[in-house]
Regions:
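Short, surface-exposed "cap/lid" segments of acyl-processing enzymes
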Residues: 2-54
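Short beta-strand/loop motif that positions the catalytic acidic residue
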Residues: 128-129, 134-136
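Gly/Ala-rich beta-loop-alpha elbow adjacent to hydrolase catalytic centers
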Residues: 86-95
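Catalytic histidine-centered segment of alpha/beta-hydrolase-like enzymes
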Residues: 59, 163-175
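Active-site nucleophile loop of the alpha/beta-hydrolase fold
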Residues: 109-118, 139
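Conserved alpha/beta-hydrolase "acid-adjacent" motif
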Residues: 141-147
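Alpha/beta-hydrolase active-site loop
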Residues: 32, 57-78, 97
Length: 186
C-alpha cells in the first residue's frame, strides 16, 4: 500500500478535511483543493487537512481513515474541534464507510462516491444522525446506483445535471460545493 500524503493549512480551530480520489494530489487538478482550502481559511476561519488516496485504498479504508484522523489529532492535541469532511470519489467512500467511528466529524459532503465497491458498507447511513450530503454528477457511472443508498432523514442525495465524475468544464461548481452543501452558503 502506498503512503497517504497530507497538506495542512493552519488557521482556526475547526477543520475542513478533504480526502482526494485515487491518485489525487494534495493540490488537486487545477489546484482545486488548494482553492477550497484558501476559501475555508478566508471565509470560514478553518484549518484544512488534505489527504491523498493511494492506489488500493478502498481495501484499507478503515486503516486509512484512522491514519487521517490521527494526523488531525496530532495537529489539534488536546483542543476540542469539529471536522467538516469532504470526500471525492473513493475518498468519499472512505469517509462514508468510517465516519461513525469519529464523533468529531460534524458534517459530510461525499462527491461522486464509487458505488460499485463494497456497497454493503453504505448500510450504516440508514441510522446516521449527522448531516450527510451525497452529490453525484448525472453523467457519473455511480449515479445510476444512487437509489441504493439507504433512506435516512439525515442523508440527502443530490444529482447535478450534465456533470461527469471529474466535473469536466465545471471546476468552479466543484469548488463551490462546500459552500452549498457543508456550510449552506449558496
Amino acid at each position: 500500500m502506498n503512503k497517504i500524503e497530507f497538506a495542512y493549512y493552519e488557521k482556526g480551530n475547526d477543520i475542513l478535511l478533504m480526502i482526494t480520489g485515487v491518485g489525487g494530489s494534495t493540490n488537486g487538478y487545477a489546484n482545486k483543493y488548494e482553492r477550497i482550502a484558501r476559501q475555508a481559511m478566508d471565509q470560514w476561519d478553518m484549518s484544512v487537512v488534505v489527504a491523498t488516496t493511494p492506489s488500493g485504498s478502498w481495501m484499507h479504508a478503515e486503516q486509512n481513515m484512522k491514519e487521517i484522523m490521527d494526523f488531525i489529532h496530532s495537529k489539534r492535541l488536546n483542543k476540542r474541534f469539529k471536522v467538516y469532511a469532504l470526500g471525492n470519489s473513493i475518498g468519499a467512500n472512505i469517509i462514508l464507510w468510517h465516519f461513525n467511528q469519529f464523533p468529531e466529524i460534524e458534517k459530510i459532503l461525499a462527491i461522486n462516491p464509487v458505488m460499485t465497491v463494497n456497497l454493503h458498507l453504505f448500510r450504516l447511513l440508514a441510522s446516521v444522525d449527522k448531516s450527510v450530503n451525497v452529490v453525484f454528477g448525472e453523467l457519473d457511472e455511480s449515479c445510476k446506483f444512487a437509489s441504493m443508498l439507504p433512506a435516512s432523514k439525515s442523508v440527502k442525495v443530490n444529482i447535478l445535471p450534465k456533470i461527469d465524475h471529474n466535473f469536466t468544464n465545471s471546476l468552479d461548481l466543484f469548488i463551490n460545493l462546500p459552500n452549498q452543501y457543508l456550510f449552506n452558503q449558496d
